[in-house]
């Protein structure tokens, strides 16, 4: 005879469960759709410029979302080697933002995710937006290392 056994756990393992309103975060009192999880970046004090360039190149290529990988890896290939220390810092801060936010800001999808003031006039974002327009109409791929 076959018996159905329901598993129960003493803790909640998932933040999102099919978008139901019953999924309340007991800590914040919000539904799963309203929960903001912000992981602060690791502070990197005294990082050498070449080490920072290598890290930023890696972080530009390995984002996890193909669209953002393509944009940022092309940007890094074109501009990273000539960036000043201040531009590297600004680009580093941009890479701390969520992938989809960067993609929407770069492609000017303000109806989905408006670009915040801190990035709207940024030289880094301006170059990224220019690159995202793909005026040459070329087929994009990950640049070689």
Curated annotation (Swiss-Prot):
InterPro entries, alphabetized: SDH (IPR005631), SDH_sf (IPR036714), SDHAF2 (IPR028882)
SUPFAM superfamilies documented for this protein: YgfY-like
Keyword Disulfide bond set for record: no
UniProt keyword list: Chaperone, Mitochondrion
Keyword field contains NAD: no
Pfam name, any one: Sdh5
Cited function: Plays an essential role in the assembly of succinate dehydrogenase (SDH), an enzyme complex (also referred to as respiratory complex II) that is a component of both the tricarboxylic acid (TCA) cycle and the mitochondrial electron transport chain, and which couples the oxidation of succinate to fumarate with the reduction of ubiquinone (coenzyme Q) to ubiquinol. Required for flavinylation (covalent attachment of FAD) of the flavoprotein subunit of the SDH catalytic dimer.
Recorded family membership: Belongs to the SDHAF2 family.
Name by which UniProt lists this protein: Succinate dehydrogenase assembly factor 2, mitochondrial
Protein species of origin: Yarrowia lipolytica (strain CLIB 122 / E 150) (Yeast)
């Amino acid at each position: 005879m076959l018996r159905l056994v329901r598993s129960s756990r003493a803790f909640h393992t998932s933040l999102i469960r099919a978008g139901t309103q019953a999924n309340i975060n007991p800590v914040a009192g919000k539904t799963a759709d309203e929960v903001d999880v912000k992981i602060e970046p690791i502070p990197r004090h005294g990082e050498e410029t070449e080490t920072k360039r290598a890290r930023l190149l890696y972080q530009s290529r390995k984002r996890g979302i193909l669209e953002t990988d393509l944009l940022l890896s092309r940007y890094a290939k074109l501009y990273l080697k000539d960036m000043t220390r201040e531009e590297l810092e600004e680009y580093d801060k941009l890479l701390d933002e969520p992938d989809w936010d960067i993609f929407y800001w770069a492609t000017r999808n303000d109806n989905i995710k408006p670009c915040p003031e801190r990035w709207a006039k940024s030289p880094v974002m301006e170059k990224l937006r220019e690159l995202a327009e793909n005026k040459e109409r070329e087929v994009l791929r990950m640049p070689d290392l």
